[in-house]
């Protein structure tokens, strides 16, 4: 840096000398003109001396200022060069960074496309073949559903009371299940599946699984048809037998709606939700029934058993709302004296305005009518023949006596 400053200083010195020489030349000419005008006298000499001294002082005073300006210009040029160098350096680094970024981007794209195309193609072809193979498989789901429906039908028929018939029906249904599972024609399988579904629904609606003999005979005929198939090809015979079996089931008597229980010519509904006593009356009326009114000891034992099995507090249609201490059924009939034995020990006690009767444990209890409890509805059953009615009616069971 010092080497570059010395030539600059020399140039500045020469420039100052030229400026001084030019000024002296111009001043000399002025002096001569003045002397020519005024003549050669002492006054002229003094004036000339004074003028020369003043000019010299002015020029000397200018020299440091010029040197200072030159130094400032050099510093400014140096600073500009330094900034330019830094800018060029940063520009170079940024261009390198940009180039590296672009290369990395291209490399990333290239690497992303590198997975083994041959392996991918092989996997794709294998998946395609597997998809086609699975698509050609027979409808296993339908066969499985047929199997499940037959299993449920077997369980439903297996609940019939006559154990000897039940075992034979169970075995025949097991063989039928295996035979139908092997049938090849899908269209016939679909028809069989639909018929079995309808048959399942029909059998499921039977209140007490009646007409065992007729079902047993139809299953025997169906077994003979299945056993006589040489190559499992006579599916039409199986189909016809199923149609006949379905018709036989549909002819069976349905004295009570689904989810109602048949007993001695009446149907009973045990609720799964809870209401107060008045709302329970309304709920029974909405289904064409009434809150249960007990007419016999057998009916009482049957209902008490149903309630105690579920361990529920259940409303009956009995209260003393009209007259305290006078218990009356919702149909207006009074409570018979012989029925008072069904009250639990110490009941009814009318503690806190307890005016409605409920099944509680192994007997009856009075409680507040506004409490929510389960309830039992009762209505007459549909007409069936005497034989069927005997099959539908379970034998009454006497509940355990209340604890002492």
UniProtKB/Swiss-Prot annotation:
Pfam families linked to this entry: Lectin_C
Cytoplasmic-side positions: 1-37
Region of interest (7 X approximate tandem repeats), ranges: 96-257
Transmembrane segments: 38-58
Gene Ontology biological-process annotations: adaptive immune response; cell adhesion; endocytosis; immune response; innate immune response
Region (Disordered): 382-404
Statement: the UniProt record of this protein carries the keyword Calcium: yes
Glycan attachment sites: 80
Compartment(s) where it occurs, according to its Swiss-Prot or TrEMBL record: Membrane
Disulfide-bond pairs as recorded: 256-267, 284-377, 356-369
Alphabetical keyword list: Adaptive immunity, Calcium, Cell adhesion, Disulfide bond, Endocytosis, Glycoprotein, Immunity, Innate immunity, Lectin, Mannose-binding, Membrane, Metal-binding, Receptor, Repeat, Signal-anchor, Transmembrane, Transmembrane helix
UniProt domain C-type lectin: residue ranges: 263-378
Organism superkingdom: Eukaryota
Sequence positions that bind Ca(2+): 347, 349, 351, 354, 365-366
Complex and partners: Homotetramer. Interacts with C1QBP; the interaction is indicative for a C1q:C1QBP:CD209 signaling complex. Interacts with ICAM2 and ICAM3 by binding to mannose-like carbohydrates. Interacts (via C-type lectin domain) with CEACAM1 (via Lewis X moieties); this interaction is regulated by the glycosylation pattern of CEACAM1 on cell types and regulates contact between dendritic cells and neutrophils.
The protein's name in its UniProt record: CD209 antigen
Organism for this UniProt entry: Macaca mulatta
Source lineage: Eukaryota, Metazoa, Chordata, Craniata, Vertebrata
